[in-house]
């Protein structure tokens, strides 16, 4: 009897536990359940929260509710809506697809498989806002201030104006001269917001829209500094002006916008894209927060959103307007080298949009006509990034005596540099000229730790070379000699599997011919060890001393920089076999990006005339040098 009672008691405990658990589960996802005629739109799933948020941000303007929810399988779902299924789920999906911009694999959910919401767009406090449409002055009180919004008339032109007073005493009066109107209709706005909590009073954003095609909103920020008030010019922005959000959670709202300098620069407006800009008020200055680590995650989410959009529209990877702004975002995140490779392999070479650079200082924001020069897209993009601060602190030029931290590639455990060799010099390798100003390229490991570097063309005297820059991650070094006017290489960024290639260099110069060594082969793989896409695999024989030398195509263009050969003994230990002619070169696209980042625009390679082997050897010899260092 006692055993039966205990069994019955345990059964009731189990039932109670199940009921409690069910109740808790319902409580957890009650706000996610959709009953009746509504469903969530499931847009994407990922394990990365920042990726999910980046995707969700793309759809905020299209739905009342967008959020990231944890699904029962542990993945993160990007959901939006809810949408009506009154005409059926199929009709609801087709309506979304017909609107455009939605993934083909979206589906509708009643939320039962969703556990909890893990992210929603920050709500923020309501921002007091007043609008002025022209006519009679708008007068109101806010933040202890008496505010009057009106206009200043100059002939038939009218400009929005704002006046601040306290207890009848004038504090400041400002006019938006960049936003003129030719009638009584205006579109001015006043927002009262805390942009700088270090100031005792909130700030005022005074803005006005031009009502012109594609453009523009001009703004002034009024803030108290010391005992008085001052105004700060905001950027002239496409569309509706600054968006406001407290990103870093310090109680001060940041100003979000886009970099209008990218609009019309690389493509017509409709095909232009512009990267995110985050600004923060500090006293009487607007501070660019691109390089502030507190905002790195926000930029990462922005990038995820861009790349998700490109996943839905793969053709935009061929649009120069998109590529330029995407590269700017990648540069902010310190990933410009990898991004340049993508840009150089995909940009639209047939675009007829005029691209120029200015070879002189701007005069009132305009380039003197005589200093304007037409250039290729890569050169125009590099110049634009430099002028607008996107090369940033990740670009670090060094002096010859500097010793940067080595960052080995994934291939290091089983690949061996094709240099250095032992001999009279402490190391030796190959390099090649890349500009008529005497710039040349070699591997970083060839010149690492050198106190003196010399280069020599065949049959000529040695010339001293100085280090301009190094990239240890990609094993590149940029050198320069002062008195060289010889041939220099052209660079091609595309690489095709199986294409014929040649290697020129000065391997084993203490044993082999000192006049250079030329070998032929093919591109055998479009990635290095560990699928490292910075590199390509080649069958052309490589020996110690070839490091830093050119990999050339059938037309005499450089398509890579020889870096290493597979360590045969290490490979034997791993595979039980000795590989033959497994060698590696850094892609031409990575070389091109490295040079652009230091202001050098290589001559673009051509494929107009194929060269036979002797002509290729002569061409390679003309711009290649032996590199020695002590």
Swiss-Prot record:
The chain crosses the membrane at residues 8-28, 258-278. Keywords: Cell membrane, Membrane, Plasmid, Transmembrane, Transmembrane helix. It comes from the Bacteria. Disulfide bonds: none annotated. Residues 404-417 have a biased composition (Polar residues). It holds the Pfam family Trypsin_2. GO terms for molecular function: serine-type endopeptidase activity. One of its GO terms (biological process) is proteolysis. Its main location: membrane. It is found in: Cell membrane. Coiled coil: none annotated. It is a multi-pass membrane protein. Gene3D superfamilies: Trypsin-like serine proteases (2.40.10.10). One of its GO terms (cellular component) is plasma membrane. Residues 399-426 are annotated as: Disordered. Belongs to the peptidase S1C family. This is Uncharacterized protein y4bJ. It comes from Sinorhizobium fredii (strain NBRC 101917 / NGR234). The lineage of its organism: Bacteria, Pseudomonadati, Pseudomonadota, Alphaproteobacteria, Hyphomicrobiales.
């Amino acid at each position: 009897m006692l055993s039966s009672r205990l069994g019955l008691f345990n059964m009731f405990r189990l039932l109670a536990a199940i009921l409690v658990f069910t109740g808790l589960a319902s409580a957890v996802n009650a706000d996610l359940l959709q009953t009746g005629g509504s469903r969530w739109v499931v847009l994407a799933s990922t394990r990365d929260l920042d990726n999910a948020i980046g995707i969700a941000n793309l759809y905020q303007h299209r739905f009342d509710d967008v959020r990231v929810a944890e699904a029962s399988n542990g993945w993160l779902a990007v959901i939006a809506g809810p949408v009506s299924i009154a005409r059926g789920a199929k009709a609801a999906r087709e309506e979304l697809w017909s609107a455009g911009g939605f993934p083909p694999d979206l589906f509708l959910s009643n939320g039962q498989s969703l556990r909890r919401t893990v992210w929603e767009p920050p709500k923020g406090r309501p921002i007091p806002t007043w609008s002025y449409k022209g006519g009679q002055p708008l007068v109101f009180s806010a933040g202890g201030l008496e505010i009057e919004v009106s206009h200043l008339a100059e002939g038939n032109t009218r400009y929005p104006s704002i006046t601040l007073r306290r207890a009848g005493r004038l504090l400041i009066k400002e006019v938006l001269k960049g936003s003129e109107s030719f009638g009584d209709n205006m579109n001015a706005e006043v927002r009262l917001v805390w942009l700088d909590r270090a100031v005792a009073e909130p700030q005022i954003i005074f803005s006005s829209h031009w009502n012109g095609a594609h453009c523009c909103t001009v703004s002034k920020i009024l803030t108290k500094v010391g005992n008085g008030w001052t105004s700060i010019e905001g950027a002239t922005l496409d569309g509706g002006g600054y968006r406001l959000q407290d990103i870093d959670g310090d109680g001060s709202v940041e100003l979000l916008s886009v970099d209008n300098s990218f609009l019309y620069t690389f493509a017509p407006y409709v095909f232009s894209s512009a990267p995110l800009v985050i600004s923060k008020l500090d006293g009487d200055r607007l501070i660019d927060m691109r390089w502030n680590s507190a905002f790195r995650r926000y930029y990462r989410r922005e990038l995820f959103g861009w790349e998700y959009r490109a996943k839905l529209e793969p053709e935009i990877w061929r649009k120069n307007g998109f590529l330029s702004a995407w590269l700017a975002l990648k540069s902010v995140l310190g990933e410009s080298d990898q991004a340049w490779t993508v840009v150089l392999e995909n940009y639209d070479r047939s675009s007829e949009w005029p691209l120029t650079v200015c070879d002189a200082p701007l005069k009132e924001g305009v380039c003197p006509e005589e200093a304007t020069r037409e250039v290729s897209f890569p050169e125009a993009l590099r110049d634009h990034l430099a002028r607008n601060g996107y090369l940033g602190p990740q670009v670090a030029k060094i002096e010859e005596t500097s010793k940067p931290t080595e960052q080995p590639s994934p291939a290091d455990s089983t690949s061996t540099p094709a240099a250095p060799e032992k001999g009279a010099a402490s190391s030796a390798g190959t390099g090649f000229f890349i500009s008529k100003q005497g710039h040349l390229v070699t591997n970083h490991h060839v010149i690492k730790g050198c106190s003196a570097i010399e280069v020599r063309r065949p049959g000529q005297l040695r010339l001293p070379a100085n280090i301009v820059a190094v990239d240890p991650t990609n094993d590149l070094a940029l050198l320069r000699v002062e008195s060289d006017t010889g041939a220099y290489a052209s660079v091609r960024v595309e690489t095709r599997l199986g294409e014929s290639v040649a290697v020129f260099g000065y391997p084993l110069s203490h044993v082999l011919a000192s006049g250079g060594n030329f070998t032929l082969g093919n591109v055998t793989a479009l990635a290095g060890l560990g699928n490292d896409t910075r590199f390509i695999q080649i069958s052309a024989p490589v020996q110690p001393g070839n490091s830093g030398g050119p990999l050339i195509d059938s037309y005499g263009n450089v398509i890579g920089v020889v870096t290493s050969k597979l360590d045969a003994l290490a490979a034997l230990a791993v595979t039980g076999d000795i590989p033959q002619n497994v060698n590696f070169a850094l892609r031409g696209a990575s070389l091109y990006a490295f040079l652009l980042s230091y202001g050098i625009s290589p001559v673009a390679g051509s494929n107009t005339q194929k060269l036979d082997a002797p002509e290729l050897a002569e061409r390679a010899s003309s711009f290649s040098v032996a590199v020695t260092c002590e």
